[in-house]
């Protein structure tokens, strides 16, 4: 199974929408357009992809008196229901955090589902200072100050 096909299968499971005939091609084109700033990890059990997560690189606009910075946005984290609670999500998250640290990102940001907030908080993510109480934006690293 190619990585693109595996991502397509997982995306279909995640959204609970059957794949349409052109979906894999649209996904391949999207992945190609994003490849300079997005990395996607796949978790496999044997030959079956059971999880995925993406890390997108955001490049901050330069500003006088401040060095340029980059930060990561974690997205598309998904583990098949039958493969949950086996450490797969934790392994994907550890890989994302390690990559963000290696790339020297100023911060790692995500917007999790309500059900996943505790999972990310256990990994060191927190609501940024000044965020509204209902927001689910979580940050690991420096704050989101302008």
List PLM regions with ranges.
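Conserved beta-strand in the GNAT
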Residues: 42, 48-57, 73-78
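Conserved beta-strand-loop-alpha-helix junction that forms the acyl-donor binding cleft
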Residues: 108-118, 133-135
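Conserved acetyl-CoA-binding loop of GNAT-fold acetyltransferases
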Residues: 121-132
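A short beta-loop-alpha structural element at the N-terminal edge
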Residues: 1-9
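Conserved GNAT acetyl-CoA-binding A-motif
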Residues: 93, 100-112
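Conserved acetyl-CoA pyrophosphate-binding loop and the N-cap/start of the following alpha-helix
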Residues: 83, 87-95
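Active-site rim helix/loop that mediates acceptor-substrate recognition in acyltransferases
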Residues: 18-44, 54, 60-61
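Conserved acetyl-CoA binding element of GNAT-fold acetyltransferases
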Residues: 65-81
